Amino acid sequence: MRVMERIEAVYAIAQHRAAYSPEEDAAHELAAGWMREAGLEVSRDVAGNLFGTRGDARVWVGSHLDSVPTAGRFDGVLGVVAAIEAAARLPDRPLAVVA
């Protein structure tokens, strides 16, 4: 299952990915690659948020890739990975994935 494999790939970077840390940056780079594979245009804003967009997006979905020490492997990353998977399965729909 691709969703679980991707969650494990992010978790393998580090269990704890503090905001603005090298570990969170690595998770963003991994997610950016998956967004491109899903046909999304990837960008970052000045605050460091990662966006994958297609078309005139009116629906935004996603979550966060940083975590706290005791949050567990699904904290934040599940929402990001699920949103990327939805984008991959809906190639003709305008949407945005936010991480």
For the regions a protein language model found, what residue spans apply to each?
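A short, flexible beta-alpha/helix-coil linker loop
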Residues: 15-16, 66-68
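Alpha-helix C-terminal capping segments
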Residues: 10-13, 52-54, 86-91
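N-terminal capping segment at the start of a domain
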Residues: 1-21
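A non-catalytic alpha/beta surface segment that caps or lines the substrate-entry region
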Residues: 16-55
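Generic structural signal for well-ordered, non-membrane alpha-helical segments
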Residues: 3, 24-28, 76
